[in-house]
Amino acid sequence: MRTQIPPVLLFLAVLTAATVQILGGPVQAHQSADPFPSTYPDPAVPLLSLPTEFRVRRTTANLTMAPGKPVEIFNATGAGCIRHLWFVFGEQDIEDLSIEITVDGAVGPQVRMPFRSFFGALLGFEAYPIDSAGLVNFPNFTVTNDPMIPKKASPGWNLYLPIPFSKGCRIILNAASAKNGGGMIDWQQYRGGVTLTPLRFHAQRSIAQPGKPTEPFPIAETEGTGFLAGYVMGWRQRDRSDMVFHNGGTRMLIDGQTDPHVICGHNVEDDFGFSWGFNQYQTRWVGCPYRDNRGRTDQDGVFYRFFGPDPILFRSSLSFTSAARPDDYEAVSYFYKVPGSKAPPMVAPQDWQVVGPFPDGISLEAFQESEDDLVRHLSQGDWPGKVTVGAKELTVHELRPTYGWVRLEGVYQTRYPYPRTDQSVYLRGTLNSTSRRRATLRLGLDNWAIVYLNGRRVAVLDHAEEFTTARIPITLDKGANQLLIKTNNRQNRERHLWAIHCAVE
């Protein structure tokens, strides 16, 4: 006897089969294959690849800060990465508020600076909006009748630069006066044993009120292995003799101990991709969030640049500076480096003396004319404060190198802060050796050079087009060896750079 299937059950069976076919098979209770890649590049810092095996976390903070009492707002142990910081404060004046960030139990914080500076609000300027890959700030200019909201309410401060950590991370706020506000820290918690980048977040701040035309203004200076992720810089014009932008631009002196090379800027706005001064446009990577144009020689402003598409890598050191006028400057740089990484030791003169200028730097023929008497005179021991050359009495300048770099652009200037061109100078340093030995002198520069060791000419270099490093075979005597270098400065591809790098391999 055959059992008849009721029509309604037959209909349900057909419907179920069709549904399974449409969905691609029966529903699985657990997917064995992980649909995500093991890592993904950070959108603000693509050079960092971060794990995808994480739990999404948020730590919130209700801030009631007593004067002078630090408040810990975040303290995580284990491995993780902060992806987003957000803060708001009821007080309009937070100039006395500071932030510290310490990762993996470092001896000192990787970040310690005024809160507003860290979030790109520089030189005490009124809060302004920032819409970039790394920083996003939302000032609230809305005036309401609500007595609880200040007439110019505190901005929403946001950071999107990742802060990875393998052992833990701690964030502390401190203020000299009472503060009330809130914060949210969005972060990812990694499982134990996760493979995490060795690079750790750092930030540095520099301020000069005013700057000195004879000294480069520091933006970032660090030793080790890492990369520059971005920076924000502000200008307040005090000197009305010329436009605030006309300062000769920035210099990046990279890997002095291992592979000296340079990146040279142009002028202020040009270094950020702009033209003809401050103009308030913002993109993910470059922008001008603030300007106050009161006249051609009376302007203030802020620029930012994040190097997501073109990070600046360094493997032993970075010295990042700007030429300066007697204006106010403030800069904050954001970079990542491997903790504890150090450059290899370098044999180089620890002190230099320089004398000049001489008017023979315009042609190679004039530059190479014999000066035996002068060379013998300058190769004898330390120079006094003044050196007489012919009828001229020239001042001797004492210089100390940074990572082997000797900077000359601030010593001789036609008009600040531009270095003289078509002039030459002599530099003198001492190389000490414990024995008589053969060695290699590594000399990097972007001009001409004549090199003397213990009064003997050992090399003539023509690097007039761009910065190049030469390796010169030399023989060092036991004890002190007198190194004398004649060099010049001309306009070339490096634009206004007047620096040399010297070391013995």
Label every model-predicted segment:
Residues H30-P345:
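Beta-strand-centric surfaces of beta-sandwich/beta-rich domains
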Residues S341-Q413, T430, Q482-E505:
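Accessory carbohydrate-binding/adhesion or oligomerization-edge regions at the termini
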Residues S433, R437-Y452, L483:
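Aromatic-lined ligand-binding clefts that engage carbohydrates, nucleic acids, or primary amines
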